[in-house]
């Protein structure tokens, strides 16, 4: 099965061995609790509209991708709020890149297979990590 990311009319094929690391950890329910003045537990719960994290990552030295594709992904990541269609093995999501609250959290991470000094678009990188957030209806 394939993994693709589409921006407008441009579709990029992503490495098929990417693993959706946080697929089963997200909850569609937001909940908060507090105590009333008589000690009664008050629970507020509601359905979330978007915001699901989608982290696709390679395992070890897998998830090879060429530098040219990485450059395209990097250009897309530099467009704030850019909505894209992510197809993960037949499931389609509208996503934006997740830049995270910290400088250490990057939307795209990878390692060079061989670190050439004169990099070419055909050079390969591995251990790819792509961080997305599923866009809400109102984003």
List each model region and its residues.
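Extracellular/virion structural assembly segments
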Residues: 1-139
């Amino acid at each position: 099965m394939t993994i693709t990311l589409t921006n407008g009319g441009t579709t990029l094929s992503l490495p098929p061995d990417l693993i959706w690391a946080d697929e089963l950890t997200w909850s569609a329910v937001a909940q908060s609790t507090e105590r009333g003045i008589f000690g009664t537990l008050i629970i507020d719960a509601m359905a979330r509209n978007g915001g699901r994290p989608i982290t696709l990552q390679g395992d070890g030295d897998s998830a090879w991708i060429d530098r040219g594709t990485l450059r395209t992904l990097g250009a897309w990541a530099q467009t704030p709020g850019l909505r894209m269609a992510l197809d993960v093995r037949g499931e389609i999501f509208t996503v934006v890149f997740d830049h995270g609250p910290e400088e250490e959290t990057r939307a795209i991470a990878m390692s060079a297979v061989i670190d050439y000094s004169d990099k070419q678009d055909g050079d390969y990188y591995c251990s790819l990590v792509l961080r997305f957030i599923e866009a809400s209806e109102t984003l």
